[in-house]
Structure formats: C-alpha cells, structure tokens
Amino acid sequence: MKTFNNVPILQYRNKFGSLEEKKADLLTIREQYDGTLIINDSMELIAYADGLHIGQDDIRAYSDDLVEAVKQIRLKIGRKVLGLSTHNKEEILEANSLDLDYIGLGAYRATHTKSEANVGGKTLIEAAKHSKHPVGMIGGVTLDDTFEEPIHYKVIGSGLYL
C-alpha cells in the first residue's frame, strides 16, 4: 500500500481553490496514495473521497437538529467515513448521539489559523474521556506530540512544516 510516511488517513482541505482545481488535486492524490482520503466540508467532492469531515457551523447548515443533520449527510455519503469537529465537553456529549465514525477535538495549541482563545490544551484530553467515538486531537499538534487513550489519532496540519 502506498501511504505517505505511514499516514493511514489523509484529509484534503482547500478553502480557496475552484471545484475543478480541487477535483484535479484529489485525482493526483489518489494516484499517489491509497490510504483513507477524507475531504473537509466539501460535499460536492464526496465521489473522490472515502469520507467527509465537517465542522460545527457546516453541520448546522443541514439542520439545527444534529441527529437530523447527520441523517441528511448520511443519505448523501452512505457509509463513507464521517467525522465532526468538536471543541469542548458539551460538543462531545452532543456528538455521542450522532452516527459518526470519529470526532476531531481541538485546538490543542495555538497556530496561525487557531487563536489562543480557542485553545484547550490538556483540558481537551479530559473532555475526550466523554466521547463514545474515536478522538483525533487537532490544532497545533506536531509530529513529536504523543497522546494516550482517550486520544486515538493525532491530526497534524501546519505541524508538518515546522
């Protein structure tokens, strides 16, 4: 299996490219990577991926009733992987009633895209204990960070470039 440095899951995130650019990117990634490919927020790209990661604001665009929102999303993606961003214990408890495959939890540390005001650090690890879903720690996570249960994955973005 071709993976990038033993990376089993890769999330594609491109907030600014055109739909055609994103499709071309995903096709290129598919040629070089056969691990699980997740897209961020872009339902229109689901045919090119193994799953969808969605944020708190984006899920509410489907319905303010999160159970109903996930039902609507599942109608479109079927049993492909579905993940949801969470930031605190309250959102984790909400997510427990949803048909998800994992949650992203963060931000762990400040980054250029996540301000100090949104950072939870070690308190997030305590919050993660309440999740019935596998938890991926996100936001300021580096290759050198290590986590134990209840954290199942570390999600590295800008930390790849340090």
What label would you give each PLM region?
Residues 4-7, 49, 98, 130, ...:
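Structural motif
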Residues 17-21:
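An accessory alpha-helical subdomain
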Residues 23-41, 65-87, 116-143:
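Alpha-helix-loop-beta-strand connector modules within alpha/beta enzyme cores
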Residues 76-109:
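Internal catalytic-core helix/loop-beta-alpha segment
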Residues 10, 46, 95, 103, ...:
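Conserved, mostly hydrophobic/aromatic
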